[in-house]
Swiss-Prot record:
Induction: Expressed in the late phase of the viral replicative cycle.
The name this protein goes by in its record: Penton protein
Species of provenance: Human adenovirus C serotype 5 (HAdV-5)
Main location: virion
Keywords carried by this UniProt record: Capsid protein, Clathrin-mediated endocytosis of virus by host, Host nucleus, Host-virus interaction, Late protein, T=25 icosahedral capsid protein, Viral attachment to host cell, Viral penetration into host cytoplasm, Virion, Virus endocytosis by host, Virus entry into host cell
Function: Major capsid protein that self-associates to form penton base pentamers, each in the shape of a pentagon, situated at the 12 vertices of the pseudo T=25 capsid. Involved in virus secondary attachment to host cell after initial attachment by the fiber protein. Binds host integrin heterodimer ITGAV-ITGB5 (alphaV-beta5) thereby triggering clathrin-mediated endocytosis of virions. Mediates initial virus attachment to CXADR-negative cells. Binding to integrins ITGAV-ITGB5 also seems to induce macropinocytosis uptake of the virus.
Entry's localization field: Virion; Host nucleus
Taxonomic lineage: Viruses, Varidnaviria, Bamfordvirae, Preplasmiviricota, Tectiliviricetes
Length: 571
């Protein structure tokens, strides 16, 4: 039995001194100073990543290699017995493929991974959805607006206006950005036809409109009017137009993402835009072109015609003189076009200069024409359209309408206190803001330390996350407005343009950059996840959205798990 080395009392010696003194003590033969052997380390700890990699299936010998586990959502053997009440986002599937087990028999089988090792699985998933961009499930088919619902006279010859918050619902479908805006406007008009028109509300009182134009183009700062007389029919960015007392509410709707209008603090509760918020965004009025052109007409048209007659006779005499000069041209051709030695001018050029000098000398003798007083043009705003719909001017002497535009308030209003201070103009997202989805494999993967084990679908531990495979696809169409006009006559989409005579209530133009929503299959590598050492023959796969709900729009869900040894089990 070897005794431990003995040292004198005091602090222990350093490691270097002990190692260097050991060979000397052994040479002297001291029984108490025997050489120190290195500590014994088991081979298992020398190779922590070796471990055991045996995989044992029921009734089969252990397999000393890795395998793969396939998670399929629509296996025919699982539908009738396991998934009759499930869907593609929450299903059960059998994972033992080496025997012809029925689903009932497979549920009693297990795949045992060597419990002397830590196991992990490389998880790869394939997810395909068929979700439309406007649907009730993702809160993209509804929005609220405050509109006028009653305009009734009172006993004292006044008008009582009544406003209410109304929820509008769009039909579900996969629409482009332009079509969605048309459907939102159509929902407001249909509510007016059903409620407002029956209670005395005028067509010019429709106080909520979604548009895409920049109503300030053509604005003259001197006159305060849009001088072309029409608003530029070009799409720039989705816009919200409101009349006094009106507003829109996107608190429980994601359609604001489609309009490209977001909050600067997106996690704050509520998203409501009212008329008072759009300070500085009043739409300028149009120039009354008919009145302007009528004021420029000259009443003395006949006098102008007489002057034109004298000009005509004068031109005839000039033609005769030109004909005589042309007859003499063959005779004087050489003389008139020859360059003299004392000047570079030809004889013809000198004659022309002499004629101009004579005309200038004779000009003072002519009687000066009497200048007629010019009429001052009439510049005034257009108050109504051809169908007598009012443009709602602020006052009779104002050049602005009561309509307020979010786009104008954002770009031309006060950036410190206006709508720009708490809203943000961003790129329109036709998907209305695609969310994330979570993968849960509660019977196969070990629960992460951030989750507790539960059997509720909404609280399953999350082992993987990815974005919902719905993307916004954009393409450029330079003839978008032309196509919109053609479709109005071929597809009879004039229902979206009920008030073509009114420049504000007219159908908004289609943007040249068209965006559509597209479902693209996604292949995601979730990395290596810790596996349980005992895997049941039937596994549950759950895919939940951001609100931890199963998603009915999942069309295909596949998962491939490749088990492998991570390390030896040390505890």
């Amino acid at each position: 039995m070897r005794r431990a080395a003995m040292y004198e009392e005091g602090p222990p010696p350093s490691y270097e001194s002990v190692v260097s003194a050991a060979p000397v003590a052994a040479a002297l033969g001291s029984p108490f100073d025997a050489p120190l052997d290195p500590p014994f380390v088991p081979p298992r700890y020398l190779r922590p990543t070796g471990g055991r990699n045996s995989i044992r299936y029921s009734e089969l010998a252990p397999l000393f290699d890795t395998t793969r586990v396939y998670l399929v959502d629509n296996k025919s053997t699982d539908v009738a017995s396991l998934n009759y009440q499930n869907d593609h986002s929450n299903f059960l599937t059998t994972v033992i493929q080496n025997n012809d087990y029925s689903p009932g028999e497979a549920s009693t089988q297990t795949i045992n991974l060597d419990d002397r090792s830590h196991w992990g699985g490389d998880l790869k998933t394939i997810l395909h959805t068929n979700m439309p961009n406007v649907n009730e499930f993702m809160f993209t088919n509804k929005f609220k607006a405050r509109v006028m619902v009653s305009r009734l006279p009172t006993k004292d010859n006044q008008v009582e206006l009544k406003y209410e918050w109304v929820e509008f619902t769009l039909p579900e479908g996969n629409y482009s950005e332009t079509m969605t805006i048309d459907l939102m406007n159509n929902a407001i008009v249909e509510h007016y036809l059903k409620v407002g028109r029956q209670n005395g509300v005028l067509e010019s009182d429709i106080g909520v409109k979604f548009d895409t134009r920049n109503f300030r183009l053509g604005f003259d700062p001197v006159t305060g009017l849009v001088m072309p007389g029409v608003y530029t029919n070009e799409a720039f960015h989705p816009d919200i137009i409101l009349l006094p007392g009106c507003g829109v509410d996107f608190t429980h709707s994601r359609l604001s993402n489609l309009l490209g209008i977001r909050k600067r603090q997106p996690f704050q509760e509520g998203f409501r835009i009212t008329y008072d918020d759009l300070e500085g965004g009043n739409i300028p009025a149009l120039l009354d072109v008919d009145a302007y052109q009528a004021s420029l007409k000259d009443d003395t048209e006949q006098g102008g015609g007489g002057a034109g007659g004298s000009n005509s006779s004068g031109s005839g005499a000039e033609e005769n003189s030109n004909a005589a000069a042309a007859a003499m041209q063959p005779v004087e051709d050489m003389n008139d076009h020859a360059i003299r030695g004392d000047t570079f001018a030809t004889r013809a050029e000198e004659k022309r200069a002499e004629a101009e000098a004579a005309a200038e000398a004779a000009a003072p003798a002519a009687q000066p024409e009497v200048e007629k007083p010019q009429k001052k043009p009439v510049i005034k705003p257009l108050t109504e359209d051809s169908k007598k719909r009012s443009y709602n001017l602020i006052s009779n002497d104002s050049t602005f309408t009561q309509y307020r535009s979010w786009y104008l308030a954002y770009n031309y209003g006060d950036p410190q206190t206006g709508i720009r201070s708490w809203t943000l103009l961003c790129t329109p997202d036709v998907t209305c803001g695609s969310e994330q989805v979570y993968w849960s494999l509660p019977d196969m993967m070990q629960d992460p330390v951030t989750f507790r084990s539960t059997r509720q679908i909404s609280n399953f531990p999350v082992v993987g996350a990815e974005l919902l495979p719905v993307h916004s696809k954009s393409f450029y169409n330079d003839q978008a407005v032309y196509s919109q006009l053609i479709r109005q006559f071929t597809s009879l989409t004039h229902v979206f343009n009920r008030f073509p005579e009114n420049q504000i209530l007219a159908r908004p133009p289609a943007p040249t950059i068209t965006t559509v929503s597209e479902n693209v299959p996604a292949l995601t590598d979730h990395g290596t996840l810790p596996l349980r050492n005992s895997i049941g023959g039937v596994q549950r796969v759950t895919i939940t959205d951001a609100r931890r709900r199963t998603c009915p729009y999942v069309y295909k869900a596949l998962g491939i798990v490749s088990p492998r040894v991570l390390s030896s089990r040390t505890f």
